[in-house]
Amino acid sequence: MSGPRSASPPGCAATRGGPEHRAAWGEAEARANGHPHAAGGATRGCSKKPGGAVTPQLQQQQQQQQHEQQHEQQQHEQQQHVQQQQRLAKRWRGDDDPPLGGDDPLAGGFGFSFRSRSAWQERGGDDCGRGSRRRRRGAAGGGSSRAPPAGGGGGPAAAGGAEVRPRSVELGLDERRGRGRAEPEPEAEAGAPGGDRGARDGDGPAGPGACCRALLQIFRSKKFPSDKLERLYQRYFFRLNQSSLTMLMAVLVLVCLVMLAFHAARPPLRLPHLAVLAAAVGVILVMAVLCNRAAFHQDHMGLACYALIAVVLAVQVVGLLLPQPRSASEGIWWTVFFIYTIYTLLPVRMRAAVLSGVLLSALHLAIALRANAQDRFLLKQLVSNVLIFSCTNIVGVCTHYPAEVSQRQAFQETRECIQARLHSQRENQQQERLLLSVLPRHVAMEMKADINAKQEDMMFHKIYIQKHDNVSILFADIEGFTSLASQCTAQELVMTLNELFARFDKLAAENHCLRIKILGDCYYCVSGLPEARADHAHCCVEMGMDMIEAISLVREVTGVNVNMRVGIHSGRVHCGVLGLRKWQFDVWSNDVTLANHMEAGGKAGRIHITKATLSYLNGDYEVEPGCGGERNAYLKEHSIETFLILRCTQKRKEEKAMIAKMNRQRTNSIGHNPPHWGAERPFYNHLGGNQVSKEMKRMGFEDPKDKNAQESANPEDEVDEFLGRAIDARSIDRLRSEHVRKFLLTFREPDLEKKYSKQVDDRFGAYVACASLVFLFICFVQITIVPHSVFMLSFYLTCFLLLTLVVFVSVIYSCVKLFPGPLQSLSRKIVRSKTNSTLVGVFTITLVFLSAFVNMFMCNSEDLLGCLADEHNISTSRVNACHVAASAANLSLGDEQGFCGTPWPSCNFPEYFTYSVLLSLLACSVFLQISCIGKLVLMLAIELIYVLVVEVPRVTLFDNADLLVTANAIDFNNNNGTSQCPEHATKVALKVVTPIIISVFVLALYLHAQQVESTARLDFLWKLQATEEKEEMEELQAYNRRLLHNILPKDVAAHFLARERRNDELYYQSCECVAVMFASIANFSEFYVELEANNEGVECLRVLNEIIADFDEIISEDRFRQLEKIKTIGSTYMAASGLNDSTYDKVGKTHIKALADFAMKLMDQMKYINEHSFNNFQMKIGLNIGPVVAGVIGARKPQYDIWGNTVNVASRMDSTGVPDRIQVTTDMYQVLAANTYQLECRGVVKVKGKGEMMTYFLNGGPPLS
């Protein structure tokens, strides 16, 4: 094929001299939108209910609803259309223009794009050397008209051109196609990872059974099914568990020391028992040292935990067997302490914690039963003890399960964030490779920066153009390609082109050339881009020689007489992209035009060069006169001296041999042969052998060995490996010191604290329920062991009703469907607000605490010592336990009758008030959403109030109990018949023991609360970092995807990015009925000139960019959603419709009518541009319909193309057309005429390659009804 092709500047001979080559111009984007088209318009009606007849009234209502919905849809589409017009008008309309309204003749029908009159007048022809108003326009517009410096990869500032409108419009991004994401719920809290996982309106359980299962589900935690994942989880929390274990050992040492002190304070001393307690302290201290050594491993954690449980059991047994006044209530406090700390601070699984808690409880009950079997009140004490131990175990479970679930959930969410990040990273790398295979890195990076940058609403679009001097441009055309294509099927044609251009791409990489575009059977590339090279002319000549050699192989294999015609010229180029959609990297300049004509005026199998190129070759090649002017009018007109390469000189042969030898040595040193190049090699899997050239590295290509190894890895293993490295690398101490305050445990950064405070704990209802359960246990304990009173029953009933109401309102959040809206709203306000939930939690804990000791005020508070002293007429200091036994009142622990003549009942077991207060402290620890400082303040308040009550108004209650317990333990049978009081054990007074044990509990619970909150905050911080990294990667991925979808059709990009596709899978499809349009500005070549005043033609390209941008905005309108922009070549705009199932309307042919409407809209738009820019651009448009073949060719730089007779004829309709007219074929005429479009017959037109054809002019759309 011969004739020039327009790949160079707008207005080169391509728009006129080579229309036959436009058949292969293509890069169509298949619409993947959410607007499926139905023939005849979309109708939405009400569906008929099954089983019922449709009455006429119902039919009428349905029809009315359909009409109303259609009317609303039309209004919505009209509103979108007006908004699109307003966006377009921002640049074209001036203050003196009439407003866009119903009376404006230019506002109806097609919705024009208006530009400011002053902007066009001041630019007009000046920017192309026709006046002196350009500088005024630049000053008024606030931007420079200069092109960005060569090699610049900056953002908007680097380009200097004026930015335009929001970035979604600036970069040609179709917003209506990106609305798949759901809008966030208005009441949902934002900004915190983890978010609100609670129930929402409209979701949640549907019945009471499901609601109960949902409540039970929050306390379930299972081992991960994968052993590897479970080990990662253990590693994830190993340091925290190690810290928790050390903390537990410290508090156990404290408890053992307290037990030793209590035993040492009361004679007689038993050294064996003291030795066991001291040995336990020593063992725990040794274990604490070992657990904090660097050699302590994750596998040692379980062994240390079970060893500690064994030590606790030994201490439990020894503590209960110590000589003391026997009592079934002795040892309850440390048993409760041991049980709870095993659940909360010991990092063991639930089964081990439950077994340990049950065993400790059983040991206490068994030893108490054996030692106090003769007590007639033992049953009440044992029942109370069972209730206390049961409550402790339940609270332990309620604390252990949510904590473990939270930890496992935090681990799982962190892993999911990392998994999503790595997945996004892999996809992003694929997108980067695909993107950078189409656009050079500096252009792609600048576009992505502009997407992310906030842009001002300015007059003109940014133009991505850079100027490069001293480059060589090569054009190569396959002579005889038409006969080759005629012998191939659609698949064979795609495979042949793919194989051929894959070889050319490989040769271009080896010869340091950058392939620009493939135009049908024409291939052109540039050397000296993106990085300048001194040997750019040599590279192009060598590339041409290799291409001629490669085509000879095709000739031998196929038997078809095909050959290459190569033309080369050296000079200056402008490179970049134009328009808003379907970008393709291209070059423009008069030198590119000349190179194009050098190929057209060349000879088959020869390299045709200009004198400029010859001057760069330094005599390394033998040449002969080319006489190009004899074969090409352009060369003759411009008196271009040309030459044909004969052969390279001996010097050049030696240099080439040396380079080849070095390449072989480098290949051998790598250790394997380069892979065979074939068409089936996907473009991003092939990097031209074993190495990547410097130019390709600059364009984003990686080493194939590293990439293949990366892609072959299992994604799950990759996630686990990455997480393992991150776990090993993170430092808990460093994170705490950098981000968290030491005592308050608040984040140092206010934003972090704000995000953390917005987290919603959807287990709040379970916390309230657990605290209410503690209240019930306290009630049962008090009812069992404390004398009954009306006040007791009324107070407990009141508290029960209040707590039931609180539990009811809190649990509604997890069962939203069962209750009315106001209750749901109240529950959400409580649960979703940290302040409200904290206040409700404090209220609940207060009720539980009051229920623990308020009955104390109903007990007899008389001083038993004083009564006995008066009875025996002795001083109170001489009263002992034997006086109790000798009292005439027959006092005993089991007697609830008031003594000393008072009517108030006797509460002989006041220590159970203390144990109830301990249970209320445990209820305080259940509320995980309350901060550790808040818990500390609350627990100190509880301790202070209770200790004041014990030590001041009700101290005699505890003194009396001490005396009665001692008396009850005296064995008078061993007195040998004497009247003396036998020797008996003494005990530390309860009024001394009570503050100590409560302080120990407060300390342990505070340490646990600090550990829980510290763990939660560190998990939040780590997960936040993982989430932010994931979001950054997703944001980068979104930028790449938006750019990528603006270059390749979405289905084509998805095809190449799919991991599961085969390497030998080509992309091609046959389309049954496609409408194709070519629209060219016929006289743009007259407008384009390269002068110093217009920045060597850049300002002319800026004008073309604005025109193409207007066309791109028009094709983005919703009514043209069936259309696809294929590409722009110079000043020619190519579009098609019906390329996929979502845009092809087989019955209604609406995709054909849409393309005809679009063509008329372009004509009207061009007229208006001429009116306001004082230019006289003339547009010719050609339309045709028929079958096409769509596919992707090019291994290194994929290019979506459409081929077929339909495309060829559409191109001929443009090239043979008349300025300012739309020419259509007979097939197109039949479809449009059947839809009442206004057409007129032009007559018979001679078309190259087709002979004579009857054609028609499209004058207008259907008449308005």
From Swiss-Prot:
The keyword Cell wall biogenesis/degradation belongs to this UniProt entry's keyword annotation: no
UniProt effect for mutating M495A: Decreased inhibition by G(i) G alpha protein GNAI1
Keyword line: ATP-binding, cAMP biosynthesis, Cell membrane, Cell projection, Cilium, Glycoprotein, Lyase, Magnesium, Membrane, Metal-binding, Methylation, Nucleotide-binding, Phosphoprotein, Repeat, Transmembrane, Transmembrane helix
Reported effect, D477 to A/N: Almost abolishes enzyme activity. Abolishes enzyme activity
SUPFAM superfamilies: Nucleotide cyclase
PTM sites of type Omega-N-methylarginine: R16
Family statement drawn from the similarity comment of this UniProt entry: Belongs to the adenylyl cyclase class-4/guanylyl cyclase family.
Protein name listed in UniProt: Adenylate cyclase type 5
Species lineage: Eukaryota, Metazoa, Chordata, Craniata, Vertebrata
